[in-house]
A protein has these predicted regions:
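Short terminal or interdomain "cap/linker" segment that borders an active site or interface and mediates
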Residues: 105-181, 188-190, 211-223
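Generic amphipathic alpha-helical segments used as scaffolds and interaction surfaces in large
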Residues: 9-12, 69, 73, 77-85, ...
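Internal, well-folded beta-alpha domain core
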Residues: 73-131
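Active-site helix-to-loop segments that bind/position phosphate- or nucleotide-bearing substrates
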Residues: 1-71, 75, 185-188, 211, ...
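Conserved active-site and cofactor/substrate-binding residues in soluble primary-metabolism enzymes
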Residues: 20, 58, 82-85, 89, ...
Length: 223
C-alpha cells in the first residue's frame, strides 16, 4: 500500500481507501502467465527468448468498470494503479519461475513499442490462442490488464533486477518513472490460479504447467 501511495502520487490520507481496494480486488484476480520459447529470426534478433503473456483476468476489469460507471472515478483510478502493481508481481514470479525451471536468467522485459514495433503484437498473439486473451485491430488486449512482452534470456546469472521496468523503459518522461537505484522450442507454458506447478491438459497438443495466484501475491500485505 505504501509503495502505491508513493509511486502513483496519492495523498497520505488515501492509504486506508487503497488498502481496502486491495482487499476487495485481490479475490477477483485470476492472474495467468503464459510463455513460448523462441530463437532468433529475421524479425527478432535475441538469441533465445520467451514471448510472455500476463493477464489478471476479466473480473478485475469488471470491478474497475463498476466503480467508473457509478462515477467513483478516484476509486477506479486507484484500482487501475493497484492492477499495475499486481501485474508487476506477476512479471517477477514469471521470471523467477523460468530461472528456477530452466536455469536461464532474464536480461530485460522488452515491451513492444521500444526495441520492436507494436504492430508485431498480432502475430505474436497467435501463440496464445485458447488463453482467453484477445487482441483487436487497435492492438489492444482484452482483458485490459493483459500485457505481452519479450523476455530475452542468458545462461549466465544476471545480478540486476530485470523486473525494475523503469531501468529498461525508453519513456524517460513518464510521470510514474522510478529513479534508477532508489522445454521444447514453441511449447507453451501456463502459470495460473492453482496452488503449485502441476501438469495440465494439453492446449491444441501443446503441454503446459501452472503456478498459483496465492504464490504470486504472498507476503505482499502492507507493502
Amino acid at each position: 500500500t505504501n509503495k502505491i501511495i508513493r509511486k502513483y502520487h496519492f495523498a497520505g490520507e488515501n492509504t486506508g481507501k487503497i488498502a481496502s481496494l486491495c482487499d476487495v480486488s485481490l479475490p477477483l484476480v485470476s492472474a495467468a502467465c503464459y510463455y513460448v520459447w523462441k530463437k532468433a529470426d529475421t524479425e527478432i534478433t535475441y538469441d533465445e527468448y520467451a514471448v510472455c503473456l500476463v493477464t489478471l483476468g476479466t473480473a478485475f476489469d469488471k470491478l474497475v468498470d463498476l466503480y467508473a460507471e457509478n462515477n467513483c472515478l478516484l476509486e477506479a483510478y486507484m484500482l487501475d494503479c493497484i492492477g499495475l502493481e499486481f501485474m508487476s508481481r506477476s512479471y517477477e514470479q514469471l521470471v523467477k519461475h523460468i530461472q528456477t525451471k530452466y536455469c536461464k536468467w532474464g536480461t530485460k522485459l522488452d515491451f513492444l513499442g521500444d526495441a520492436y514495433p507494436v504492430d508485431m503484437m498480432a502475430r505474436l498473439m497467435e501463440n496464445f490462442t485458447g488463453t482467453g486473451v484477445l487482441i483487436n485491430d487497435e492492438m489492444m488486449l482484452k482483458p485490459l490488464k493483459s500485457v505481452l512482452f519479450l523476455l530475452p534470456v542468458s545462461d549466465q546469472e544476471e545480478k540486476a533486477d530485470v523486473c525494475r521496468i523503469c531501468t529498461n523503459c525508453g519513456n524517460v518522461n513518464c510521470m510514474f518513472r522510478e529513479e534508477i537505484g532508489s522445454e521444447q522450442q514453441n511449447s507453451i507454458q501456463k502459470i495460473s490460479s492453482i496452488p503449485k506447478i502441476n501438469s495440465m491438459s494439453k492446449n491444441n497438443g501443446i503441454p503446459g504447467g501452472s503456478y498459483g495466484i496465492r504464490q504470486i501475491f504472498k507476503n505482499e500485505g502492507g507493502k
